[in-house]
C-alpha cells in the first residue's frame, strides 16, 4: 500500500491533554463510565434493563422495563430515548426516520490478527482505499476489526463461512500466522434523521435521533454533543426556566444533524467507495494537501 496521508497528533498537543486517538469498544467504555456517573450521586445506572413501553402523564412519564426479575416500573419528569437506531422510544411515538440506506453491505471480521506485523508502520486505525477491495483496520485493546466492502453478487451466508472469511483475510494481507476469528458482523450503512427530537416530555438523542456513515466517528461525537446540549437545558429547567427551551435543543441538534453531520458523512462515504480513477486522484490529492 502507498501512504496518501496521515494525521500528526502533535498538531493538537496544545489544544488537548490527550493528543491521540483511542479506539475503545463500548463494553470497556461502559465499565469506566458507570462508576464515574454514580460517583456524582445524581443518578444510578441499571444494567440489564430493557424498555418495554412508556406513558406520558402531562406532568411526568412512567416507563415499564424488563429485567431478569420481571417487569419494573420507573417514573421521571422526562424520558430521554438514547436507545439506538432501533429505538423503542422513537417507534412507540411513531416519529418518522427519513433518509436512505446505502446499497453496499459491509463485513466486519474481528480477530487476534497482528496487523502491525503484516503492515509495518501502519497506524492503529487505517483507511485503505482500493477500487477493488478497500478495507478499514481498527486495532482495539483486545481485538482487531477489519471491515471489508462486500461485492453486490455475494451471498451473505456463504460470505460468513469461516473458510471464506479466512480466504478474504488471506487475499488482502497475504500469508498470515495462525489467528482466531472472534466475531463477525454484516451490516448496512444508513443516513437518517428523526422528524423531531422532542415530543412533549420525551426526547431523542444519539443514534435514536440520527444515523450516519460511522467512518470518522461523527455518530458518536454528535451523540455526545446531543447529550451535553440536553443536559445544559435540564439544568436550566431545574433552576426554574420553562421547559420550552427543550424545543431549542430539538431544533438546534436536528439542524446540526441535517446540515453538518449528514452532509459530511455522506461525502466521506463516497470518498471511500469511489472507483473512477480521476475521482480517486482528486480525493488522494485533497487528503495529501490537508
What are these regions (language model features)?
Residues 1-290:
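Core Rossmann-like FAD-binding/catalytic domain of the broad FAD-dependent monooxygenase superfamily
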Amino acid at each position: 500500500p502507498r501512504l496518501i496521508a496521515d494525521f500528526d497528533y502533535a498538531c493538537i498537543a496544545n489544544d488537548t491533554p490527550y493528543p491521540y486517538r483511542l479506539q475503545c469498544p463500548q463494553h470497556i467504555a461502559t465499565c469506566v463510565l458507570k462508576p464515574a456517573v454514580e460517583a456524582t450521586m445524581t443518578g444510578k445506572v441499571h444494567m440489564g434493563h430493557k424498555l418495554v413501553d412508556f406513558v406520558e402523564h402531562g406532568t411526568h412519564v412512567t416507563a415499564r422495563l424488563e429485567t431478569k426479575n420481571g417487569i419494573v416500573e420507573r417514573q421521571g419528569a422526562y424520558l430521554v430515548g438514547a436507545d439506538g437506531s432501533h429505538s423503542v422510544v422513537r417507534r412507540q411515538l411513531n416519529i418518522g426516520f427519513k433518509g436512505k440506506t446505502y446499497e453496499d453491505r459491509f463485513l466486519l471480521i474481528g480477530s487476534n490478527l497482528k496487523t502491525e506485523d503484516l503492515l509495518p508502520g501502519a497506524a492503529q486505525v487505517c483507511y485503505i482505499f482500493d477500487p477493488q477491495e478497500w478495507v478499514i483496520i481498527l486495532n482495539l485493546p483486545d481485538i482487531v476489526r477489519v471491515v471489508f466492502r462486500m461485492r453486490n453478487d455475494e451471498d451473505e451466508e456463504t460470505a460468513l463461512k469461516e473458510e471464506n472469511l479466512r480466504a478474504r483475510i488471506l487475499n488482502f494481507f497475504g500469508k498470515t500466522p495462525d489467528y482466531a476469528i472472534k466475531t463477525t458482523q454484516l451490516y448496512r450503512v444508513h443516513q437518517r434523521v428523526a422528524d423531531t427530537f422532542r415530543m412533549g416530555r420525551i426526547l431523542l438523542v444519539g443514534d435514536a435521533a440520527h444515523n450516519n456513515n460511522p467512518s470518522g466517528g461523527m455518530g458518536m461525537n454528535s451523540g455526545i454533543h446531543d447529550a451535553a446540549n440536553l443536559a445544559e437545558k435540564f439544568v436550566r429547567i431545574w433552576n426554574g426556566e420553562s421547559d420550552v427551551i427543550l424545543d431549542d435543543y430539538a431544533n438546534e441538534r436536528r439542524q446540526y444533524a441535517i446540515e453538518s453531520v449528514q452532509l459530511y458523512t455522506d461525502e466521506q462515504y463516497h470518498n471511500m467507495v469511489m472507483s473512477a480513477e480521476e475521482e480517486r486522484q482528486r480525493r488522494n490529492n485533497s487528503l495529501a494537501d490537508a
